[in-house]
Amino acid sequence: MDWKGRDVISIRDFSKEDIETVLATAERLERELKEKGQLEYAKGKILATLFFEPSTRTRLSFESAMHRLGGAVIGFAEASTSSVKKGESLRDTIKTVEQYCDVIVIRHPKEGAARLAAEVAEVPVINAGDGSNQHPTQTLLDLYTIKKEFGRIDGLKIGLLGDLKYGRTVHSLAEALTFYDVELYLISPELLRMPRHIVEELREKGMKVVETTTLEDVIGKLDVLYVTRIQKERFPDEQEYLKVKGSYQVNLKVLEKAKDELRIMHPLPRVDEIHPEVDNTKHAIYFRQVFNGVPVRMALLALVLGVI
Amino acid sequence: MDWKGRDVISIRDFSKEDIETVLATAERLERELKEKGQLEYAKGKILATLFFEPSTRTRLSFESAMHRLGGAVIGFAEASTSSVKKGESLRDTIKTVEQYCDVIVIRHPKEGAARLAAEVAEVPVINAGDGSNQHPTQTLLDLYTIKKEFGRIDGLKIGLLGDLKYGRTVHSLAEALTFYDVELYLISPELLRMPRHIVEELREKGMKVVETTTLEDVIGKLDVLYVTRIQKERFPDEQEYLKVKGSYQVNLKVLEKAKDELRIMHPLPRVDEIHPEVDNTKHAIYFRQVFNGVPVRMALLALVLGVI
Amino acid sequence: MDWKGRDVISIRDFSKEDIETVLATAERLERELKEKGQLEYAKGKILATLFFEPSTRTRLSFESAMHRLGGAVIGFAEASTSSVKKGESLRDTIKTVEQYCDVIVIRHPKEGAARLAAEVAEVPVINAGDGSNQHPTQTLLDLYTIKKEFGRIDGLKIGLLGDLKYGRTVHSLAEALTFYDVELYLISPELLRMPRHIVEELREKGMKVVETTTLEDVIGKLDVLYVTRIQKERFPDEQEYLKVKGSYQVNLKVLEKAKDELRIMHPLPRVDEIHPEVDNTKHAIYFRQVFNGVPVRMALLALVLGVI
């Protein structure tokens, strides 16, 4: 697989070998950065971050990654300051901006926008989210985090908790995990179960999948608990939401039954699905997970720029 | 002419020698950048981009140019995030910001703002548009593009198409072209003809100027067709606009009569005055023209910073 | 005092030795920058500027300082483009952003926000204003300016003019000046006198403090006149404001009685409390004062990053 010039649009475009390449490159870059303090792989290169809708954490993570590689950044943080307002097509905007840079990171409210940008641009395009919150770099940093914490992904028992129906983050992660030998525990209220076709796909690929509505029943088995925000606005009935909400908050009491090695992850931002009291336990790794976004994005930038 | 510390406010301040210096410096920097990948002329220098009104493409082009020279960038993309809101005068804002940087690029909705900024500031000021869309760097990149495509400007037949009445871009380009031995074809609907005083000025300076309302009549003669956006909002009558619009769209049919060497330019953004089907023809160079903005702005920055 | 990793939240946290360290480091960095053109103390380091409310001059000053040190900058200029909108706590935002950077500069509308950020973050946090316009770097650059102009602070007669009641900038400056042997002249309308408890505190610390409502009476004695904006909106009565306003404008007439060495300072932005005609006199140093913000912020960044 030639990485130079490659677009990164969906995790579905990645083979297991691709994923392993990204994880190994991220590990190497993280180590080199720690040793040397400053890398110069992307010296003289320019990243354009085109955020047609705001997403501070994702934008700052990519910009940090580019700077850590010694490169420069241009771009915009929201569409209101972009020339999109003048009625220009996305196609023309991309054809224009690519003249100013070596790689594009795009975030766009419309599904398919990143794919279109990739088709139009000659420089590589990385999808930082289009239409939903799903984006391939989140899944890659999730996998990187699991591997870094346990030294492996194979053999782990991984629980996904929360909104498994609409949450694209957990859909992508579950699909990517089929490359590995893991047991998957899907923990959600009835209303928010993982769609049937995804569960079937996971099982067809040989994955052991357990579904439950009660975290307490499975917490003792898990190596990883991946928590997602339950989005209140999805619920037709406020009372229904409130009942569900309480039963799913991860707090110290729930964790009494957890294994010592349990790691709790979250793509953030969180609202109340993890109580702040959990932050100081050895289980909480969600801020380390945030940190891991930087080496993973460094790896992707270095690979598609062809500088590593 | 000493370039170090010079302000770049209007193309009218430029002699032919000045223009040639910019074009030659741009050519040199473009070549050096290609050979070395990274230049360091502006290492340790800071550009402040003060965009009192948004203009993403112009801002990103300047920022890219500064980074390509190895320099750094600070600034703001729109006035709402600037301290202008606190009732500070433009004069004080400029006197303040110049303490933080080595060169200023300013875009401002009020005509004369860039000239005022230049008078106030001790660091050099480059006008990225004030009051109208005219700005000298557009004209310079237009000239650079023509020279790069043909190896010369003299002897060419250049058509300007569209709104020649209000379009400052074409006014500036036409005036700058009087330094060269070109034939100018002014193609526009009656309502949007080039103002009489400009046409007279061009002819007084010895330029051959032909005016027409019909692109088809002259397309076969042209080496360059410079297309501008016809701004719908200028027309008192929607029907009149629609009739005009159709007759002026550059598409494959119109291009059947064009010379092989014809190059089509556009300052962008475009709306529908060039059909996307033209993009893949050998005639379309408007995205290369966008790219040329970078070496031209690199040249200006390096010259006024006195680092080349 | 170990500076590496230290937070800079309030000038009240600073000993005289701390202040002297910052001033000496700023002087050294300003000299080195002049000699070498470009410093690399912060090469490979990343500053995150988190401006939850806009403050262009402060943000650009910090960003300039970081670039002058050879470092990189990420961040946002106003809260609307940040993920705060998704209901995330400030605590989580800080814990997240610190994963992307080596030092944080924060500006926040709520008092106490910077202190909270400092408690949460493992990277050093510098307060660029929270709740009021007071921030420690303003006071430090004011002291640096006085020392640079006179070679010393001890022995000077310093006047503070304007809104001494609400103006936190002058409160902080007055408090910091108790470390030095200065005479302080508090010049304000009756309604805007310095709060009693501050005046008493100053006197208890041995400072000679003179209060007056009439600039003309004391202008001839002063070495420094520090002017602040009188904020119209504080006045219950427009007529009262207008009367006060006129009597306090610093203009050429008022300056007739001033000593030759008088230096006029202002934290800016100004509205009309200093007439523009004063700008070109030898007394006006408020734009040099702006410039001094850069070496002072360079010093703070270098110190808390532990790179000097």
From Swiss-Prot, chains A, B, C:
EC number: 2.1.3.2
Pfam families per the UniProt record, alphabetical: OTCace, OTCace_N
Keywords, sorted A to Z: Pyrimidine biosynthesis, Transferase
Enzyme class of the recorded protein, top EC level: transferase
Gene Ontology process terms (BP): 'de novo' pyrimidine nucleobase biosynthetic process; 'de novo' UMP biosynthetic process; amino acid metabolic process
Functional pathway: Pyrimidine metabolism; UMP biosynthesis via de novo pathway; (S)-dihydroorotate from bicarbonate: step 2/3
Binding site for L-aspartate: K86, R168, R229
Sites where the protein binds carbamoyl phosphate: R57, T58, R107, H135, Q138, L268, P269
Top-level taxon in the UniProt lineage: Archaea
Molecular function GO labels: amino acid binding; aspartate carbamoyltransferase activity
Catalytic reaction annotation: carbamoyl phosphate + L-aspartate = N-carbamoyl-L-aspartate + phosphate + H(+)
Gene3D superfamilies tied to this protein: Aspartate/ornithine carbamoyltransferase
Biological role stated in the UniProt entry: Catalyzes the condensation of carbamoyl phosphate and aspartate to form carbamoyl aspartate and inorganic phosphate, the committed step in the de novo pyrimidine nucleotide biosynthesis pathway.
Family of this protein: Belongs to the aspartate/ornithine carbamoyltransferase superfamily. ATCase family.
Subunit: Heterooligomer of catalytic and regulatory chains.
NCBIfam families: asp_carb_tr, PRK00856.1
Protein name: Aspartate carbamoyltransferase catalytic subunit
The species this protein was found in: Pyrococcus abyssi (strain GE5 / Orsay)
